[in-house]
C-alpha cells in the first residue's frame, strides 16, 4: 500500500489539508436519526472503543462488540471491558455481516490486519468508521467501493470522552468523509449522528478531511500535547531538585501543575493563563516563552515536515515491524526518570501557588501552544483545526499526568502519539541544555516576585502581544460555542 497523501497531486494535497468548517448547532438538529435503528458494531474495546460505545449506547444506539475469537476464548481485557458493561460480544463472523456501521477503534498498528479481516464480511452498502485516519492516509488502505468511509475523531483520550459526556458536555470532535468512499452521499449525515452520539456536538465539531485530521493530529500530539509536557516535566523536576527544592514538593508541583495551569488555558486561552500571574511574573513568562520559541522552532518545523512527507510514519512502521523495540525501550526509560519515581508530597498546594511557583511551566505551555499552532498553519492546516490540536486538547492530556504522571499519559494516548512524543522529547532535551543552565528557582519552584511594580509601557506591549496572537483570536470565538463547558471536578 502507498501513502495516500503522497499519491495526490499538490493541488489536492493542499485542498484536503485546508478542509475545515466549524459546524453550527443547528446542523445537528436531526440528532442520531441517521444511525437510529441501525446495528452498530465496534471492533476493539480499549480506551476509545469502550468509552465511545458507552456514550453511544446512552444516546440510544444499538451497540455490540466484535472481537477476535482468541480474545473471547481467553477472556482478555477487551472481552471483560465489553461484557462487564453489559454489551453483546461476538466474533467478527458473528456480528460484522449484519452491521450497518462498523467502527474500527483498534490501535493504529492493528488497522491493516483488522480491516483486511472485516472488509470481506461487511455487507453491501454498509459504513466503516475510524476515529483516526492514519490507516487511510499514511498506510493507504483501499476500502471496497460500495462501503462508505467516515471519521468521528474526539480530540482527547478515550477516558475523557466518557468523563466529559457524563458531565453533560463532550469533547471537540473532527468529522470527515473519505472522498474515495461516499457512494451514496450519506456519509456526512452519519458522521454528524456519530458525533451527537458521543456528545461531541456540545463542545464544537469541525468538518475536516482524513488528511487534515491526520497531519494536524500527529503534529499536536508529538509536540505540545505530549512531547513538551514530557520534556518540561523531566527538566523542571531535575532543575528544582538540583537547586535544593524538596523533591516531593517538586513532584507535586509538576504532576498537578500542568492540569491547574491548562484549566485556565481551556477557559480563557493564553490570555487567561497569563493573567493568573502578577505583572512582573507575566512579563518574565512572556520573555521566557519568546526565547523558548526561538530555540524550539526548528524542531517543531522538522516534526511537521516529517509528518507531511510521511517520513515519521515510515519510521514508526519500521518499529511496528520490529515488535516496537524502540517504543518499548523508550517507555521503560521514561519509567526510570527521577520525576516518575518520586512520590508527590501529601501537603496541599493552593491553586494560585501552582501559577506563582510555576512561571517556567507557564512559559513552556505558551511557547509550545503558539509554536504548534504557527507551524501547523504555515503547513496549510486551517486555524480552527490547529487550535483544537494544540490549545484545547492540552488540558485533557494534562489531566492524565495528574492521575499517574507520564506513565498514565503514555498509557492513555495511542502508541502512535507515544512514539512521536519520545522522538520529540529525545531531541528537545538536548536543545534546551544551555537554556536550562540559566534557570533558577525564581521561575520554577518559588515565586518570581512578591512586588507588582512594572514599567507600564512594557506591560501594555506584552499584554497586546499575548492577546493579538492568532490562536487567541480564533480561540475566543470557538470557546463561545462551548456553552455547556464546566470546570474539571
Curated annotation (Swiss-Prot):
Cofactor binding mode and count: Binds 2 magnesium ions per subunit.
UniProt domain KARI N-terminal Rossmann: residue ranges: 17-208
Record carries keyword NAD: no
Annotated residues for binding of Mg(2+) 1: 217, 221
Name of the protein: Ketol-acid reductoisomerase (NADP(+))
Residues the entry annotates as binding Mg(2+) 2: 217, 389, 393
EC class: oxidoreductase
Domain KARI C-terminal knotted: 209-344, 345-485
Catalysed reactions listed for this entry: (2R)-2,3-dihydroxy-3-methylbutanoate + NADP(+) = (2S)-2-acetolactate + NADPH + H(+); (2R,3R)-2,3-dihydroxy-3-methylpentanoate + NADP(+) = (S)-2-ethyl-2-hydroxy-3-oxobutanoate + NADPH + H(+)
The entry's keywords: Amino-acid biosynthesis, Branched-chain amino acid biosynthesis, Magnesium, Metal-binding, NADP, Oxidoreductase, Repeat
Pathway terms, separated by semicolons: Amino-acid biosynthesis; L-isoleucine biosynthesis; L-isoleucine from 2-oxobutanoate: step 2/4; Amino-acid biosynthesis; L-valine biosynthesis; L-valine from pyruvate: step 2/4
Any one GO BP annotation for this protein: L-valine biosynthetic process
Family from the record: Belongs to the ketol-acid reductoisomerase family.
UniProt EC number: 1.1.1.86
GO molecular function: ketol-acid reductoisomerase activity; magnesium ion binding
Function statement: Involved in the biosynthesis of branched-chain amino acids (BCAA). Catalyzes an alkyl-migration followed by a ketol-acid reduction of (S)-2-acetolactate (S2AL) to yield (R)-2,3-dihydroxy-isovalerate. In the isomerase reaction, S2AL is rearranged via a Mg-dependent methyl migration to produce 3-hydroxy-3-methyl-2-ketobutyrate (HMKB). In the reductase reaction, this 2-ketoacid undergoes a metal-dependent reduction by NADPH to yield (R)-2,3-dihydroxy-isovalerate.
Amino acid at each position: 500500500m502507498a501513502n495516500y497523501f503522497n499519491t495526490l497531486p499538490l493541488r489536492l494535497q493542499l485542498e484536503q489539508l485546508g478542509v475545515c468548517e466549524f459546524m453550527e448547532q443547528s446542523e445537528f438538529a436531526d440528532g442520531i436519526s441517521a444511525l437510529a435503528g441501525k446495528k452498530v458494531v465496534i471492533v476493539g474495546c480499549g480506551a476509545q472503543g469502550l468509552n465511545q460505545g458507552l456514550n453511544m449506547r446512552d444516546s440510544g444506539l444499538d451497540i455490540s462488540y466484535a472481537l477476535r475469537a482468541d480474545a473471547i476464548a481467553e477472556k482478555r481485557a477487551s472481552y471483560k471491558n465489553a461484557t462487564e458493561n453489559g454489551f453483546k460480544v461476538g466474533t467478527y463472523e458473528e456480528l460484522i455481516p449484519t452491521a450497518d456501521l462498523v467502527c474500527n477503534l483498534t490501535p493504529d498498528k492493528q488497522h491493516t490486519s483488522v480491516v483486511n479481516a472485516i472488509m470481506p464480511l461487511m455487507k453491501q452498502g454498509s459504513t466503516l468508521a475510524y476515529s483516526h485516519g492514519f490507516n487511510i492516509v499514511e498506510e493507504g488502505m483501499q476500502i471496497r467501493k460500495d462501503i462508505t468511509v467516515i471519521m468521528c475523531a474526539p480530540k482527547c483520550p478515550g477516558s475523557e470522552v466518557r468523563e466529559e459526556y457524563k458531565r453533560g458536555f463532550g469533547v471537540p470532535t473532527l468529522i470527515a468523509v473519505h472522498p474515495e468512499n461516499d457512494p451514496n452521499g450519506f456519509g456526512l449525515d452519519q458522521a454528524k449522528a456519530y458525533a451527537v452520539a458521543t456528545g461531541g456536538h456540545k463542545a464544537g465539531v469541525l468538518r475536516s478531511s482524513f488528511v487534515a485530521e491526520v497531519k494536524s493530529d500527529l503534529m499536536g500530539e508529538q509536540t505540545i500535547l505530549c512531547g513538551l509536557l514530557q520534556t518540561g516535566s523531566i527538566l523542571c523536576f531535575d532543575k528544582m531538585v538540583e537547586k535544593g527544592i524538596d523533591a516531593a514538593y517538586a513532584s507535586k508541583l509538576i504532576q498537578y501543575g500542568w492540569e491547574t495551569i491548562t484549566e485556565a488555558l481551556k477557559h480563557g486561552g493564553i490570555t487567561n493563563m497569563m493573567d493568573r500571574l502578577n505583572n512582573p511574573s507575566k512579563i518574565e513568562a512572556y520573555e521566557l516563552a519568546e526565547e523558548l520559541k526561538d530555540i524550539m522552532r526548528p524542531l517543531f518545523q522538522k516534526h511537521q515536515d516529517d509528518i507531511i512527507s510521511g517520513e515519521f510514519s515510515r519510521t514508526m512502521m519500521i518499529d511496528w515491524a520490529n515488535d516496537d523495540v524502540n517504543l518499548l525501550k523508550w517507555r521503560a526509560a521514561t519509567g526510570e526518570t527521577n520525576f516518575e519515581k518520586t512520590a508527590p508530597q501529601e501537603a496541599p498546594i493552593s491553586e494560585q501557588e501552582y501559577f506563582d511557583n510555576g512561571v517556567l511551566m507557564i512559559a513552556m505551555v505558551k511557547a509550545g501552544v503558539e509554536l504548534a499552532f504557527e507551524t501547523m498553519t504555515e503547513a496549510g492546516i486551517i486555524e480552527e483545526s490547529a487550535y483544537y490540536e494544540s490549545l484545547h486538547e492540552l488540558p485533557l492530556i494534562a489531566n492524565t499526568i495528574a492521575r499517574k504522571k507520564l506513565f498514565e499519559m503514555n498509557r492513555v494516548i495511542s502508541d502512535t502519539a507515544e512514539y512521536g512524543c519520545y522522538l520529540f522529547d529525545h531531541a528537545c532535551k538536548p536543545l534546551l541544555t544551555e537554556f536550562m543552565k540559566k534557570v533558577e528557582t525564581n521561575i520554577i519552584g518559588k515565586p518570581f516576585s512578591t512586588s507588582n511594580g512594572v514599567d507600564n509601557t512594557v506591560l501594555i506591549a506584552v499584554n497586546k502581544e499575548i492577546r493579538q496572537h492568532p490562536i487567541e483570536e480564533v480561540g475566543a470565538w470557538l470557546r463561545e460555542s462551548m456553552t455547556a463547558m464546566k470546570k474539571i471536578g
